[in-house]
Amino acid sequence: MRRERFGERPLSFVKLISYPRTPPGEAGVNAHNDAGFLTLLLQHGVGGLQALAPDGEWLDIDPPPGAIIVNIGEMLQAMTGNYFVACTHRVIATEPRFSSAYFHGPDLRTSLAPLALPARFA
């Protein structure tokens, strides 16, 4: 993406997230969408991440070892006119777990505008 899309200082950061074991029926992290552009996530071999399917069912995300999970954020959804949709997700921590996340979004002072998508994406 061109610099004007994300500003001079895009808001990007990495976070190591620790989830303690939660009681049955409770979420370690409640259902939410990431607000930024996109998130790259490593689960480190312990499951618990779930994504909400269009039919309302929660799906366990069980990637192969070393795989990177890509979550679409609300800013990418807005910029593509809902072509890409933010992934509603949560964490059910049946055992202690760690994940590493890279969050990417625009400079907080940047005005966002819809992207001009090719007609084939309409």
Question: Which sequence ranges carry the predicted segments?
Answer:
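C-terminal flanking tails of non-heme Fe-dependent oxygenases
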Residues: 1-122
